[in-house]
UniProtKB/Swiss-Prot annotation:
Region of interest called Pyrophosphorylase, as start-end residue ranges on this chain: 1-236
PANTHER family on file: BIFUNCTIONAL PROTEIN GLMU, NUCLEOTIDYL TRANSFERASE
The species this protein was found in: Granulibacter bethesdensis (strain ATCC BAA-1260 / CGDNIH1)
Binding site for Mg(2+): 107, 234
Region (Linker): 237-257
EC number assigned by the record: 2.7.7.23, 2.3.1.157
Record InterPro entries: Bifunctional_GlmU, GlmU-like, GlmU_C_LbH, Hexapep, MobA-like_NTP_Trfase, Nucleotide-diphossugar_trans, Trimer_LpxA-like_sf
Protein name in UniProt: Bifunctional protein GlmU
Cofactors named for this entry: Mg(2+)
Pathway: Nucleotide-sugar biosynthesis; UDP-N-acetyl-alpha-D-glucosamine biosynthesis; N-acetyl-alpha-D-glucosamine 1-phosphate from alpha-D-glucosamine 6-phosphate (route II): step 2/2; Nucleotide-sugar biosynthesis; UDP-N-acetyl-alpha-D-glucosamine biosynthesis; UDP-N-acetyl-alpha-D-glucosamine from N-acetyl-alpha-D-glucosamine 1-phosphate: step 1/1; Bacterial outer membrane biogenesis; LPS lipid A biosynthesis
Gene: glmU
Active site, UniProt feature: 353
Gene Ontology BP, a term: lipid A biosynthetic process
Localization, UniProt: Cytoplasm
């Protein structure tokens, strides 16, 4: 998950391995498409790579068209047989451009741009032919240990030892392999082509490029990065843990940028949520993907926003829902149990209670009464409603689209509006009230007499 500025100019290639089945997820969805903070793991990693690498290639498995669509416009290559990580990386080398190439895993979505930049810069120092990421997990037991040796020019990696094969001294090492490697493209292609599958699973492992790099007379440098960035996500438990980690980071970033949250631990943000300074967010608010909120807006408790823009000094909620395509002008009000979808509210417009506004444009300062509904769907097509500036929509009005309410027009409460209403007109579309004296008392007597 990237939290850093862009690095310029990007160069080289990032190869993302995304062909794994992810069986521990117990899901029909490909592992890299599971979301964290409203964004797939794959898109998190692509976003981190883009400021550093000019070219990105994603390796997918057979029948993974959904992953290819998620990767677009970046090219994909199919690993027809899942023969290991080195084999997967080798499939991509025909698409790799000159310069550095980094091999990454699609289930490591929290790597930051800063860490990737550090990895590339370490490789470019010239004393190491291969740079790799390493970490110190709180529970290192299942990870391969990074064994280093001292040389005249510094400490370099001598080998990776899997935990099952490590002796007591090696198991005591806390520096562990994160599985991310960076080298020049020509060397990487040669090493990948030289990896053998002489192991119990008969697979070609990416980590086996290390002895090949050393055998060629080169050094391998380890770049240590935070475990929270490099942890793999292989199960729903780990997915939930990653979500919690990311939410903490996003909340802190928002608070540091001047957002007020009365109960930040209950607020859920998306990776692309943009909240301006002096926005006030109440408890239990959810921001889905694609939300921007301008300064001074207040989002009250239990509101849900996605794909919308909220203008300055607006008031949202509590219990409001803003769906994709909704745009609120400055000073607009959207109150409790109001739902907006593809709706534009002009400056100062208000819809304060129990309302559905879909496929509608509401003018400035218009007032939408409680219980108003835009009837936008005829069973086949969606239709739009237009409400002019300063219009007043009476409570419990049904606006049957397509329909236009003119500037300054008023609709009577309980009306079903099927025709356009001219500017400054009063529209009444309901039966005339009839009062029948004593009829209620007569009805009660009849009912009681039937008991």
């Amino acid at each position: 998950m990237d939290q850093t500025p862009s690095y310029s100019p990007p160069s080289g290639t990032a190869v993302i391995l995304a062909a794994g089945l992810g069986t521990r997820m117990k899901s029909t969805r490909p592992k890299v498409l599971h979301p964290i903070a409203g964004r797939s793991m794959l898109r998190h990693l692509i976003a981190a790579c883009q400021p550093v690498f000019s070219h990105i290639v994603v390796v997918i498995g057979p029948d993974m068209d959904s992953v290819a669509r998620e990767a677009a416009p970046h090219p994909t290559v199919v690993q027809q047989e899942r023969l290991g990580t080195a084999h997967a990386a080798l499939q991509a080398m025909a698409l790799v451009q000159q310069g550095e190439v980094a091999i990454l895993y699609g289930d490591n979505p929290l790597i930051s741009t800063a860490t990737l930049h550090t990895l590339v810069q370490r490789r470019r120092q010239g004393d190491a032919v291969l740079a790799m990421l390493a970490m110190r997990p709180p529970e290192p037991g299942r990870y391969g240990r990074v064994i280093t040796e001292k040389y005249q020019t510094g400490d370099y990696v001598s080998r990776i030892v899997e935990y099952a094969e490590a002796n007591e001294q090696e198991r005591a090492v806390t520096l562990c392999n994160a599985g991310v490697f960076c080298a020049d493209a020509a060397s990487m292609a040669a090493w990948l082509g030289g990896v053998e599958n002489a192991n119990s699973k008969g697979e070609y492992y990416l980590g086996d490029i290390i002895p090949l790099a050393i055998a060629g007379g080169g050094h391998v440098a380890a770049v240590e990065a935070p475990y929270e960035e490099l942890r793999g996500i292989n199960s729903k438990v780990e997915l939930a843990e990653a979500e919690a980690t990311v939410q903490i980071v996003l909340r802190r970033k928002a608070l540091e940028n001047g957002v007020t949250m009365t109960a930040p631990e209950t607020v859920f943000l998306s990776a692309d949520t943009l909240l301006a300074p002096d926005v006030l967010v109440g408890p239990h608010v959810v921001f889905g993907p694609g939300v921007t909120v301008e300064e001074g807006a207040e989002i009250r408790a239990f509101s849900h926003l996605e794909g919308c823009h909220v203008g300055r000094h607006t008031l949202i909620g509590p219990y409001a829902r803003l769906r994709p395509g909704s745009v609120l002008g400055a000073g607009a009000h959207v109150g409790n149990f109001v739902e907006l979808k593809q709706a534009t509210l002009g400056e100062g417009a208000k819809a304060n209670h129990l309302t559905y506004l879909g496929d509608v444009e509401v003018g400035a300062r218009a007032n939408i009464g409680a219980g108003t509904i835009t009837c936008n769907y005829d069973g086949v097509h969606k239709h739009r409603t237009e409400i002019g500036d300063d219009a007043f929509i009476g409570s419990d009005t049904a606006l049957v689209a397509p329909v236009r309410i003119g500037r300054g027009a008023i609709t009577g409460a309980g009306s079903v509006i099927v025709d356009d209403v001219p500017a400054d007109a009063l529209a009444l579309a309901r039966g005339r009230q009839v009062n029948k004296p004593e009829r209620a008392a007569e009805i009660r007597r009849q009912l009681k007499g039937s008991v």
